[in-house]
Amino acid sequence: MKQISGNKLLVKALKEEGVEYLFGYPGACTIDISDELYKQDDVKIILPRHEQALVHEADAYARTTGKVGVCLVTSGPGATNLVTGLATANYDSVPLVCFTGQVARHLIGNDAFQEVDIVGITRSITKYGVTVRRREDLGRIIKEAFYIARTGRPGPVLIDLPKDVMAELGSAEYPKNVNIRGYKPNTDVHIGQLKRAIKLLNKAKRPLFLAGGGVVISRAHEIFREVVEKTKVPVVTTVMGKGSIPTDHPLYIGNLGMHGAYAANMAVSNCDLLFSIGTRFNDRITGKLHEFAPHAQIVHIDIDTASISRNIQVDIPIVSDAKEAITKMNEYVQECSTGKWLGQISQW
């Protein structure tokens, strides 16, 4: 069986995962990976002048394309310079896979030159992080990293690569499938819960859609616009949800919250149904929790179970991918009687 180094397998894995661009800054612990990348043309290298710029560039790439942003940095300061970017991606649900160089395994824990426990440092700001301790685990871990980053609620994954593991020869095979015990993200919408929510929507006198980043991340712009136009229900957005519907659309009111539009905040304060999709209800939009949407029943669709009823208690929780839920909604919704409500909003 053909054997190749871990460095070669990493480059092969990037190609298999369809990576077009890698944002990287070389250093001693990743120089051999850089050499392998130099030998091929499929994965293009974006070289910044600082690792912090690099991770923000990868973040921007992921947001604009919907693909996983990929980073490569060396150990020590190279790795620690990722921290702010990782925290940003984690907070905003941006899929990244960040590879960090690490000293050889026998030096880990011995205060070696440019050795830091980057997995430990970033544990609370990454979706998943791991140090590859065995060459035979490398392919599986890379495959899992991309899967975890892009599925469920997207987020950053950090893979720490000891220099000796990457130099070691091993299998050239890269896994085709992934099966992670205990990690089975739910994407299918519960039809019963969705129909309950739509029933409330049809009965409401002053309904309002709240679109968060989940609508944008799931690329649900077009189908969401169809639902809005079919129901004639007005829309407010979070900062992350801006762009989920054109800002010049007649049913779009504006951003909600402390940096939002007066009309949007008044609409939330006076609505009798707040139909929220893909938002965390953080303090920037809620203000005082006990005063938020005081007259409304609340529907909350979100792919992350932990986000539902964490800040605001909701009446109908639905765990689902935003696009999946909105697509199903489009099959059942009908035009709502919102003429009087829209007239009131226009006065604000």
Report residues per predicted region.
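Phosphate/pyrophosphate-binding active-site segments
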Residues: 2, 136, 172, 199, ...
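Anionic-ligand anchoring segments at beta-strand to alpha-helix junctions in alpha/beta enzyme folds, i.e.
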Residues: 20-59, 72, 189, 196-274
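A short, small-residue-rich loop immediately preceding and capping a beta-strand
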Residues: 20-23, 43-46, 64-103, 210-213, ...
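Glycine-rich beta-alpha junction loops
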Residues: 27-29, 103, 161-167, 213-215, ...
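Short glycine/serine/threonine-rich phosphate/pyrophosphate-binding segments
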Residues: 30-32, 53-57, 77-86, 90, ...
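Conserved thiamine diphosphate
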Residues: 113-152, 270, 321, 325, ...
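Conformationally flexible catalytic loops at phosphate/diphosphate-handling active centers
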Residues: 148-203, 341-342
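Phosphate/diphosphate-binding loops
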Residues: 257-308, 316
